[in-house]
């Protein structure tokens, strides 16, 4: 049976790399993103499906997960990775006390509410073997000056993960790939394709994943 994986934020960066990694492992991928042309081109390349999705709109997220549930050999969704995220301002130079209300609201609506919507809409299409992999970062747990609303949103997303894990029969956890070289922050870091391998591994260890945060150290210890 082919695994069906839904990824938001798949138009580029880490989301695209995660979609590619799962497709390389034989999964059927359902791709959501705001850049319609980018996700449709990627879906054509990977043999998956794509739907223009703004995670701030729960109805668009609902449609993506419904499409994903019909994309594979069997109905349903096996894995969801809510990767869509935004960062308003310059990382390291975006203090919370200077953050505009509009920027704070958009960050939380995308990085927290978008995660909530993706998981909430995925669960009805999952059986008890389903897995939810929520990307996170160290700023969620270790305060760093200048990361403002982004850090707050990631901390809140980790809190949402723990509650979903307590409430749902599926394995729900966070994956921390460290700093990844994407356009989101422009800080350099690990190649997205390397970081994506951490997600495919995390999907294979649901007992270790559920309610936890899996990072590079866990992956390297398990795969060395």
Model-derived regions: residue spans:
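Conserved glycine-rich cofactor-binding loop
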Residues: 11-12
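Conserved glycine-rich Rossmann-like NAD(P)H-binding loop of the short-chain dehydrogenase/reductase
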Residues: 25-41
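The beta1-alpha1 cofactor-binding region of Rossmann-like NAD(H)/NADP(H)-dependent oxidoreductases
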Residues: 37, 51-66
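C-terminal helical subdomain
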Residues: 170, 174-175, 186-224
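Catalytic loop of short-chain dehydrogenase/reductase
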Residues: 128-156, 161-166
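Conserved mid-core segment of classical short-chain dehydrogenase/reductases
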Residues: 86-102, 146
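Amphipathic alpha-helical dimer-interface segment in Rossmann-like NAD(P)H-dependent oxidoreductases
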Residues: 66-73, 109-130
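Catalytic Tyr-X3-Lys loop
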Residues: 97-116, 157
